[in-house]
């Protein structure tokens, strides 16, 4: 007897659902790369999950649910359960004497042994085959019990044997009408009163359990059928049908049709009257006239001449007129100019501005001139203009350095006027020399800083090297 090396993971989990299962050893025994991938992430009573580990775990759960995942069975007790069942089936097969039943049961045992000899076995298949074996064996036992209880007398003796009838309380008239003894081969049926009938004795038989089909029965399913020589004679008798009650014997000829859901039936047509049939018939049609049909027909309409009946031709088109000769004489240019000037003046008077004239020029495609600022325009504050330019991010122009003192005095003279808009820059122009000196000092300071920076960096490097040497010496 060869023991199995693998078993179903689903069966193992169902059998050990109340036991504590260690995740590490369990995943090492399960066959498949998914279980090994998840088992590598198990350690220190914790599981480290990433995307790949979760996908492998879901695939393993799907295989376990579909009963396609297997695991190693190290203990021999886990695989000896089916072999013990197989031994019990063999013991039951020894007592089977019928050749047909023995052949069918032996084929089931051969299929179970073939499944147990392979390395990978599905417990569901073995359980289905075991159920088929016990089902066929129960059928064989039920047939054997029925055959053992049938009488062994000859057919002639069976016809002379009468079945015992139970004594039922019948009225005296019925008991008097019954014969004293009726042979079995000629039964005489007597109709008892309503709802009272006799039932023959039925032979005791074992209750046969209903055959329950399995969910994965093989295609070569077999059904045990006994041979003709072992067929059991049917000794059952159907009880007589009780007579109909009194209220059902006489059924009315017409059935009520006014029940709910019944379709109404149209009444039959009334019968013909008993009077003479000729009086009720319609009068005959009038006879045709005896005159000639051709003379009675109206004459056809006269033929119309198509040439005379055509509509008249359309009228001729109007004559062509020369546009040059038909145009009116032009109006005097002087009068035309006066009218245009009057219209423009009226438009300017009504509108109050030159917008209409500007629009007309734009429509005519003329090049417009730039508008000249008005002489009396309000003066703008230079400070506000400067601030607005700074806010807008415009680049300010640099001040021109005045080298000649005479030019500076001339500028001051030009600026120092009675106009208030020009006297605002007086203070700024007088401080030009001081501003230029400050700019020169700022440039000298930047040059000094630029020259000192390499020296400072060289000094810092020496100090850093000295510090590192001191640290090493310490």
Curated annotation (Swiss-Prot):
SMART domains, sorted: WH2
Location of the WH2 domain: 354-371, 382-399
Bias type Polar residues, positions: 163-184, 204-217
Region (Disordered): 152-328, 366-385, 434-474
Domain of life: Viruses
Feature: compositional bias, Basic and acidic residues: 227-237, 434-460
Keyword terms, alphabetized: Repeat
The keyword DNA-binding is assigned to this record: no
Low complexity biased stretches: 152-162, 255-264
InterPro entries: WH2_dom
Keyword Transport among UniProt keywords: no
A molecular-function term among this protein's GO annotations: actin binding
Comp. bias intervals (Pro residues): 310-320
Protein name: 61 kDa protein homolog
PROSITE patterns noted in UniProt: WH2
Organism: Orgyia pseudotsugata multicapsid polyhedrosis virus
Record's function text: Probably plays an important role in the persistence and survival of the virus. May be a structural component in the envelope of the polyhedron or the envelope of the polyhedra-derived virus (PDV).
């Amino acid at each position: 007897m060869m023991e199995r090396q693998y078993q179903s993971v689903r069966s193992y989990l169902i059998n050990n659902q109340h036991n504590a299962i260690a995740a590490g050893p369990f995943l090492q025994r399960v066959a498949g790369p998914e279980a090994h991938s998840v088992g590598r992430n198990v350690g220190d009573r914790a599981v480290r999950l990433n995307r790949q580990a979760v996908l492998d775990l879901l695939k393993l759960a799907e295989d376990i649910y579909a009963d396609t995942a297997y695991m190693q069975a190290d203990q021999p007790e886990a695989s000896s359960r089916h072999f013990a069942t197989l031994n019990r089936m063999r013991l039951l097969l020894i007592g089977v004497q019928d050749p047909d039943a023995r052949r069918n049961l032996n084929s089931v045992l051969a299929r179970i042994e073939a499944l147990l000899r392979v390395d990978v076995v599905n417990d569901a298949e073995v359980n289905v085959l075991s159920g088929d074996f016990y089902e066929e064996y129960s059928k064989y036992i039920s047939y054997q019990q029925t055959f053992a209880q049938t009488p062994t007398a000859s057919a002639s003796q069976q016809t002379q044997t009468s079945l015992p009838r139970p004594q039922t309380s019948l009225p005296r008239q019925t008991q008097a009408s019954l014969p004293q003894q009726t042979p079995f081969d000629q039964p005489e049926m007597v109709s008892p009163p309503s709802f009272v009938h006799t039932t023959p004795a039925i032979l005791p038989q074992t209750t046969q359990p209903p055959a329950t089909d399995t969910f994965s029965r093989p295609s070569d399913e077999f059904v045990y059928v006994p041979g003709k020589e072992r067929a059991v004679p049917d000794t059952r008798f159907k009880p007589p049908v009780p007579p109909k009650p009194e209220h059902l014997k006489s059924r009315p000829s017409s059935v009520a049709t006014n029940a709910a859901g019944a379709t109404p039936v149209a009444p039959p047509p009334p019968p013909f009257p008993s009077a003479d049939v000729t009086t009720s018939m319609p009068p005959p049609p009038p006879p045709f006239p005896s005159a000639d049909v051709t003379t009675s027909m109206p004459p056809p309409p006269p033929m119309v001449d198509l040439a005379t009946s055509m509509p008249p031709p359309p009228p001729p088109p109007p004559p062509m007129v020369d546009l040059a000769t038909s145009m009116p004489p032009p109006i005097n240019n002087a009068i035309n100019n006066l009218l245009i000037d009057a219209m423009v003046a009226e438009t300017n008077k009504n509108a109050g501005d030159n917008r209409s004239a500007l629009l007309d020029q734009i429509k005519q495609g003329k090049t417009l001139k730039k508008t000249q600022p008005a002489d009396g325009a309000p003066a703008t504050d230079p400070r506000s203009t400067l601030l607005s330019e700074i806010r807008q991010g415009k680049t300010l122009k640099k001040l021109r350095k005045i080298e000649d003192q005479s030019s500076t005095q001339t500028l001051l003279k030009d600026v120092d006027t009675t106009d208030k808009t020009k006297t605002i820059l007086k203070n700024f122009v007088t401080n030009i020399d001081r501003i230029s000196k400050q700019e020169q000092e700022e440039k000298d300071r930047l040059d000094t800083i630029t020259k000192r920076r390499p020296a400072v960096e060289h000094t810092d490097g020496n100090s850093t090297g000295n510090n590192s040497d001191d640290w090493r010496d310490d």
